[in-house]
Amino acid sequence: MGRPELGALRPLALLLLLLLQLQHLSAADPLPGGQGPVKECEEDQFRCRNERCIPLVWRCDEDNDCSDNSDEDDCPKRTCADSDFTCDNGHCIPERWKCDGEEECPDGSDESKATCSSEECPAEKLSCGPTSHKCVPASWRCDGEKDCEGGADEAGCPTLCAPHEFQCSNRSCLASVFVCDGDDDCGDGSDERGCSDPACPPREFRCGGGGTCIPERWVCDRQFDCEDRSDEAAELCGRAGQGTTATPAACAPTAQFTCRSGECIHLGWRCDGDRDCKDKSDEADCSPGPCRENEFQCGDGTCVLAIKRCNQERDCPDGSDEAGCLQESTCEGPRRFQCKSGECVDGGKVCDDQRDCRDWSDEPQKVCGLNECLHNNGGCSHICTDLKIGFECTCPAGFQLLDQKTCGDIDECQDPDACSQICVNYKGYFKCECHPGYEMDTLTKNCKAVAGKSPSLIFTNRHEVRRIDLVKRDYSRLIPMLKNVVALDVEVATNRIYWCDLSYRKIYSAHMDKASIPDEQVVLIDEQLHSPEGLAVDWVHKHIYWTDSGNKTISVATTDGRRRCTLFSRELSEPRAIAVDPLRGFMYWSDWGFQAKIEKAGLNGADRQTLVSDNIEWPNGITLDLLSQRLYWVDSKLHQLSSIDFNGGNRKMLIFSTDFLSHPFGVAVFEDKVFWTDLENEAIFSANRLNGLEIAILAENLNNPHDIVIFHELKQPKAADACDLSAQPNGGCEYLCLPAPQISSHSPKYTCACPDTMWLGPDMKRCYRAPQSTSTTTLASAMTRTVPATTRAPGTTIHDPTYQNHSTETPSQTAAAPHSVNVPRAPSTSPSTPSPATSNHSQHYGNEGSQMGSTVTAAVIGVIVPIVVIALLCMSGYLIWRNWKRKNTKSMNFDNPVYRKTTEEEEEDELHIGRTAQIGHVYPAAISNYDRPLWAEPCLGETRDLEDPAPALKELFVLPGEPRSQLHQLPKNPLSELPVVKCKRVALSLEDDGLP
C-alpha cells in the first residue's frame, strides 16, 4: 500500500487544530456567558466545589457555608470536651451557656424544656419558679429589680422599714434624722408633712424662714451657710450699713466673672446665652447679640449649634431651626425604582410592559423575567434574592457583605458598649460574659455584682455626707455638721472615708462607722492647702492624691498624712476632679481653665499626657471604670456626659441634656449604671452607662451636692503593693515610694520621691537638703519649685549638717554652707513631664535589688575632690604664667628733652614691653547699659586707690537676666573704679651713645 499524498493530510491537520483550539477555549471559559478563568482563593481560605472562597476556619464547623456542603465533606466526627455541652446536632458549646436564656445550639437544644427541666438551682441561688427553669443569685432577692421573667424574685418582699427609719409614702425608707428637717428627702414630701418648727439644739442657729439649724460658730464667719444668707446678715453681725458681711472667694478680674451666688466662671461665658451661674446672674442684663459663627439664631434670639439646624428635631424654643428646611427626595427602598432618566417610580411598575420611565429603563426586555439566582446562586455566597431587574445578595444575621456578593462575619465586639463587660465574637454572632464577682442577668443582659455587701452611694451635700443603699434604698446621714465639704473618696478594705473641707482648708479621715463622731475625725493635711477640690485614694499603695485649684498643684501623701510631696505645679490652671488606677499605675484629672482638658500621668508624676483637649469646656467630675477601661466625665458648659478609653480614644458622647445635665459636678460608675450630681437641679441622677437611657432620679431637694463615690469591694480590686514586694522596706526609699506607670512589661514598678524642700540623692533613694546658692537669688529660685518651704517632714533624716533648709521665698535668711554640695537632680524620663523644677522625685528606674551602699560621704567626696583638683591646677597655671611674664619683661626709663624743658616736674609713664605674640591685654567683656564703649584710659595723673574693688567687680560680671543691686551705683566709667598702679615720677637722662 502506498503512502498517502501530502495534500490529502492537510484537511485532517486543519480539523485537528480546530478541535484543539475549541478545547482550549472551553477550558478557559467553562461557564456559559464567559465568566473568566478559574477563581483562586487566598491561603487562609477554603475553595468550595462551586468555586466560592470561605474562611478556612469555617471548614468542618458543621455549618453549610459553601451552600453545596462541600466544606463539611470528609470531616472527622467531633467529640465535645467534658466542660462543654453537646447539642442534639453534635455542636459543642460551653456548659455555662446551657439554660442561660439564649439559644447557642443551632437546634435550640441547650434551652429546651427537656434539658433545663432536670436542672436544680444550687444553694446560693434562687429559683424563678417551676415554669421558668431559671436560677438567679440569692443576693438579687428583693433588690428592687425584677430578674425573673415573672418577677418571682421581687414577690412577697417586706416593705416595712427598720425601727430607726421612716417609711415614705412611696414605700422608700429614710433615716429618722431627715424627718422634719426642712428638706423633701422622700421626694413626695411625706417626711415634711405635719411638721412644726422645733427649736434648734443648744449652740445652734436657725436660718431664716424656719430653715435648717447650723452651729453658732458658723454665724458671722463671712461665709454663707444658710440658703437665705441670714447667718451673715448685717444687723446680726453688727456691721450695719455694710450689707452682707460674707466675702466670696476672689475671682480673677481679668479672666473670670463673679456670680452673685459666689462662683467664678470664665469671662467669655458672660452673656453667651447659657446660664452657667447657679443664680443665672451671668445672663442678667445682657443685650441680645449676634450668635457665633458656628451657631444658628432662633426666632426668639437664642442661639443653638448650627449642626442642629434642619436635623428634624426641635432645638429652638420656637422651632425656628426646623422652619424652611427642604426635605430631600430619596428613591430608596424595595418599593421604589430609580429611572436612568432621573424619575422615581413605584417598584410595582417595573417590568409591567408599560413605560413609566421616559427612557424605558423600567422595561429592559433582556432582563425582565430573568432569574439570575438560578445559576450558581447568582454568585452570592449566602442568600440570593431575585428582583424584577437584576438580583441582590444578602447575608444572614451576624454577617455583612464584603464585595456585594461575599458575606463575612461581623465583629460586634468592635463596639465597646456591645456587652456589659466581656464580649466574645463568634461566627455569625457574639456572646456576652461577666468578670469574676459578677453574673449575667438573663433578663436585662447586664452584669450584676454577686460578691460582697450591697453597694452604697456616698455623696457630699455641703454641710454633711450622706449615703444611699442602692439595694435596700436606705437613706442615711454619714457625717453631719461639716462646714463646706466638696471632695471625698473611700477605702473599702479599711472601711475608711476621706474628705476635704474648703472652709477649714483641711483633709480629714475617719472610720465609716464612727465618722459622725467629731473626736474620731482625724486631720491628715492642714498646711499649704488653699482649695482642695479633688481627692482620690490609692487603696493598693496606701496614698491619697488631691488637686488644689488655689495653689495650682497636684500632690500626694500617705494615708496617714505624715509624708507628702507635690507632683505637679506647672501647666495647671483650674484642676478639679482626680481619679487613680493603682492596677496600672496611672492617675487622671480634669482642668477647667482657659484651655480646658483632661490629663493623665503616672502615679509618680511621670509620663504626663493630655487625653482630651477639644470639644471640652467645663469638665468637672471624672470617674474610672476599671473593668471596661474607660473614663467618664461630665461637662457643665456643654451639658454632656461622655467617655473615652484610658488612652484617649474611642470617644463617645453618652448623654446630652440641658435638663438632666444642667450643672453636673460629680460622677460615678458601677455595674451598668452611671450616677452624677447636679448643682442646679439639686439632685442625683442615674442612667444606663451603655446607651444613656433609663434616666432616673435617686435623690432630690439637696443642698449643693458635689462629689459622689460608690462604696463596694468590687470597685477596688485587690492587688500587690510593688513597694512591699521589694527586698527592702518601702522599696528602699527613705521617704515616699510611688508606683510607676505600667506602660510595658519592662516598666519599673516604683520610684522614690522626697518632700518639697529636699532633693533625691545620687542613689535615687535617699533625700538631702537642697544646697544653698551663694551667687544670686534668681539662680536659686530657678532651680527650686515654687511652693512655699515647709519644715522637715517627719521620718526624714538630715544626712549632712552643713545642708540648710532651702526656701525660694527668703533665700537670704539662711546662711550658706561653707562647702555646699550640688546634688545632681534626676532628669525627666518623659518629654511630656514638666521641667525638673516641678518635681523632686526620682525619674531614674533602678533595680529593686540594688544595694544602699552609696553614702553621703561618698557623694560629698565625689563632688568636692574634683573641685579641689581643678582649683589647684588653676593656681599652678597662674603661678607659672606670672613667673614667665616677669622673666620676659624688661623696663626702660627715658627722658624727653623737649618735654623736660617745659615741664620738668611732670611724671613720666612707665612702659612695659612684653615678648608676647599678643599686643596689649584683652579686657573681659562687661555687661553695661552705657552708650559708649569702655576703654582702658592711659594714666594722665594721680589716681586714687580703691580699698575694696569687689562691688565694682560684681557689677561688671552680673549674670545675664539677673537684677543689678541698687545699693552700689556704677560710676561713669566702671573701669575707673578698678585698682590701678600709680604712675611713677622718674627723671632719666639720655647719654650720647653715638646716635645722630
Curated annotation (Swiss-Prot):
Biased composition (Polar residues): 802-815, 840-851
Molecular-function GO terms, alphabetical: amyloid-beta binding; apolipoprotein binding; calcium ion binding; calcium-dependent protein binding; high-density lipoprotein particle binding; kinesin binding; low-density lipoprotein particle receptor activity; reelin receptor activity
Consequence when changing E102Q: Same affinity for RAP. Same affinity for Reelin
Record region (Clustered O-linked oligosaccharides): 773-831
Domain EGF-like, chain residue ranges per copy: 364-408, 409-448
Family annotation (Pfam families): EGF_CA, FXa_inhibition, Ldl_recept_a, Ldl_recept_b
Binding sites annotated in the UniProt record for Ca(2+): W58, D61, D63, D65, D71, E72
Gene3D superfamilies linked: Laminin (2.10.25.10), Low-density Lipoprotein Receptor (4.10.400.10), TolB, C-terminal domain (2.120.10.30)
Domain LDL-receptor class A: 40-76, 79-117, 120-158, 160-196, 199-238, 250-287, 290-326, 330-369
InterPro entries documented for this protein: 6-blade_b-propeller_TolB-like, EGF-like_Ca-bd_dom, EGF-like_dom, EGF-type_Asp/Asn_hydroxyl_site, EGF_Ca-bd_CS, LDL_receptor-like_sf, LDLR-related, LDLR_class-A_CS
LDL-receptor class B repeats: 495-541, 542-584, 585-628, 629-671, 672-714
Parts of the chain on the Cytoplasmic side: 882-996
Entry-linked SUPFAM superfamilies: EGF/Laminin (SSF57196), LDL receptor-like module (SSF57424), YWTD domain (SSF63825)
Topology versus the membrane: Single-pass type I membrane protein
Record GO biological process: ammon gyrus development; cellular response to cholesterol; cellular response to growth factor stimulus; chemical synaptic transmission; dendrite morphogenesis; endocytosis; hippocampus development; layer formation in cerebral cortex
PROSITE patterns (UniProt xref): ASX_HYDROXYL, EGF_2, EGF_3, EGF_CA, LDLRA_1, LDLRA_2, LDLRB
Transmembrane portions of the chain: 859-881
Main localization of the protein described in the UniProt heading: membrane
Gene knockout outcome: Mice which are deficient in LRP8 have neuronal migration defect. Targeted disruption of LRP8 and VLVLR together results in a phenotype virtually indistinguishable from that seen in 'reeler' and 'scrambler' mice. Subtle effects of VLDLR deletion are found mainly in the cerebellum, whereas lack of LRP8 predominantly affects the positioning of the neurons in the neocortex. Besides brain formation defects, LRP8-deficient mice also exhibit male infertility. Does not affect endocytosis of SEPP1 in the kidney proximal tubule.
Family: Belongs to the LDLR family.
Name of the protein this chain belongs to: Low-density lipoprotein receptor-related protein 8
